[in-house]
Amino acid sequence: YIGGNDSMDTVSKLSRYAETVNSEIRFIGIPKTIDNDLVLTDHTPGFGSAAKYVASTVREIAIDASVYDNKKSVTIVEIMGRHAGWLAAASVLARKFEGDNPVLIYLPEVAFDPEQFLADVQKAFEHTSNLVVCISEGINDGNGKFVCELASDVGVDTFGHKMLTGSGKYLENLVKARLGVKVRSIELNVNQRCSSAMLSATDEKEAIASGSFGVQAALKGTTGMMIAFHRTDDADYHITYAPEDVNLICNQEKTVPLDWITGNGSDIGQQFIDYALPLIQGSVKVPEE
């Protein structure tokens, strides 16, 4: 069964049920989620390609923002991520040098204060006139209230998760009202998870390898496991695969380590860059027919 957290929950339920009825069916979970939020695995297939898309797109947005006049402007980019900010963190890979755009990056792992955000923007204007700010859709006040909920009520999906939209638009209106500068918000939307134009070759290779490992594990009688990725301590990037108990994985959520978040919650540190760079390497030729 291939997928993310809810899929691993399904593997857990099916494998436990099969055991109670003495079924010989084997259930193996293969991780696949751009959210990169599964525990007991270094990362998940899909994240590398999505991170590459985010970094490349934010780079292009930053270039576009820089070509206009020198009047102060803010471009807010809203990126997927309800409780884990892995994808928004990947926007740091768009930078060419220290201080480059995106100047500010906010993740749901750290409580978001709108007043501090405005202060951060004003301080950033001391160094550049064209700011790009990247945010996770799930930025929140630290007490369970999402920033997007400050603007409107939201519904829930079939799994009971709040459906988030509007964090970028809320901050756009806030900046416009309080700072009076040119501002726009951009929601990267579904292309983050479905674009095939910038696939990571590393991501593709590991997805195939983990699927193959999972099939072999099932043929050996393994069940109720997820194929996890383990990064070795070698100087060069290297991954090994191993089955992990899916019951210890489902309904858990891996978030970005707090010590990887810097700038008092408004930036991403070198630890994340070192972690993510190997995952976006290599290109895959996109079929043209």
Model-derived features with residue positions:
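Accessory alpha-helical/coil subdomains and C-terminal extensions
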Residues: 1-3, 9-28, 44-184
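Flexible loop/turn segments at secondary-structure boundaries
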Residues: 8-9, 36-37, 83-85, 141-143, ...
